[in-house]
Every structure is written in structure tokens, then in C-alpha cells.
Amino acid sequence: MLLASFAMFAAMPVSAEDDGEKVDRTPKLHGTIRGKYEYQTEEGEGRFQVRNARVSLDGKLTKIVSYKAEIDLSDEGKIKMLDAYTRLRPVRGLDFTIGQMRVPFTIDAHRSPHMQYFANRSFIAKQVGNVRDVGATLGYSFNVGFPIKLEAGMFNGSGLTDQKDFWTSNINFSAKAQFFLPRGFNITLSTQKIKPDNVSVMMYDAGAYYHAHGWHVEAEYLYKHYGNNAFDAVHSVDAFVSYDIPLRKCLFTKISPLVRYDYMSDHSDGMRYLDGKEDTAGQLVINDYQRSRLTGGVTFSLDLPFVSDIRLNYEKYFYRDGAIAKPSERDKIVVEFMTRF
């Protein structure tokens, strides 16, 4: 019923005059479906999974006011509300956003599922720097010979928790600067403060990429510090290379061989645990053990890139001595079909 309602609403064309300028009020319906098969080579076990079934609705009410609402009907089998915000753009280059959103932080963690290069996200994007929250941001884009985009915001700092009775006296923020340099180069710097429990967590991220002539080369480093020395600082790295090979008169429009290295030290999610359960009488524990990973693979594009892709990856994990690997964080072969509409 929800999908049917979205589709009916999106199919209704509406327009309005705004200061003499015609505004298309027709809502735009988008979606991303990712179905995959994974086989863990050491355990000899496999599984099918719907990783995402996202549906979003966005549009404009006036030339100043826009909106977006996005849900995931199957985020590893769970329904989640992802984005729900209103955006105001009073003048060119300046925008104000309020609601629930992905915070402006990092490069890889800010990618939507259809924009990912690999079937499974990097450690930065999945464990260390993946934060959605409720708050407000201010963004400003300008040009100094090359484009610059600045974003900063204040948030609850607790993630997507029960918002009804959540109150805080903490200032939780995120800030990000992107420099779109000539010849396909980009430098991105960002920082974020959160407080998921009783300990403040500061994160600092620096990354750069080159995107031109079929190449995408990217490297990113994230440093995560816990207040009151509650947990050792976390270091995380993500680096990868992808090259597009266009094809003609073929089922695929291009193929893209790619390789990635990522690493993370022992990581805590910032919550206190006692006897394996969240408990305010406990302390911060290791939720993700130190590991590195090599990922190699090929992406087959059936249409435009990031519209209909088949991602074939192999992941090789390297854990530190004494580490405990989670059931789904082991050597595996992954075949994923991604469709964006």
C-alpha cells in the first residue's frame, strides 16, 4: 500500500507560478534494489540477501522550498526511515536543511547504495563513520576558480533513536568542506562530534580522489577519539582504484575492474555494555575487532553507471591475533545485482 500510494502521488503532475517563474511540483519517485548472493569460502556456507529496497520521494514546492522522504523496506531485513527533511534555498548557493538525514561527514560513508563501487561498504562507511541523525545543516557553495562546498550542522548526536523523549544539553555537530579542483581532483575534509551514550566522541576525516578518463582513484583516513580515555582511539583507512572499460555492441555498456584495501583498529560504538548487553552500569567494549581487508572484483554495467550494475567481488580478511570475527565478516565471494530507478 505504501508503494502504491507513493506511485499514485508521484504520477500526479502539478505546477505553480513562483514570482513569475514556473515551478514543477511533480514529486519524483526513486528507488534502489540490491539483491545479492554471498558465499563464505572457509565455512562453505552461502546465503541470498536483499540488502536494500529503498524508496524515496522528493520534489519542490516553490523555487525555494524542496523536500525528501526516504525509507528502506529491507535494510538487511528491517524497515528503516532514512531521510525526512525540508530544504530551503533562499539565494543561489545557500541552503538550509532540517530533519532526519545523513550527516555531512566523510566521502565513502556519504554515498548512497547505488553510488557505491563495491558490493559491501568500506569499514569507514559501515562501522566507523556511518551516522544518520536528526538536526539542521547550513550549506554554502561558491567558486574561487574552482567550486567549493561548505556544510555544517547541529544534531541530536544520538543517531536514529526514539526522538519523542530525547533531550540533550550537548552540542553535537558535523562540518565538511569539499574542494572540487581542476582535472578531476577532489579534496574533502570533515569533522564530527557525537555522544551516543555518556562519552563524547570526536571524529576527523581527510580524503581525496581523482575521477577522470575512466579512472577513479580514492584514499581516505578517519581518526576517532573517545572522551575521558574511555576507549583507545580508532584509526581507519579506505583506498581503492577503479577503471572503466567501455564496450560496444555488447550486453554490457562497460566493465570496471577494481581493487580496494581498507583497515580499522579495534572499534567501539560508544555505548556501554555489561554481560554482552547495553547497560549504563557497564563500559565501552570492542564491537568490531581490528582487521584489514583486500577486495578485488569487476562491475558489469547494463546501462548507465550506477543504474543497473552487477558487482562481482572477492573479499579477503586479515584479523589481529585474538580477534573474534563476526559471522558475516569473513572471507567471501559476493555477487550483487543493483537496480536504480
PLM region spans:
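Outer-membrane beta-barrel pore domains
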Residues: 41-43, 62, 87-89, 109-111, ...
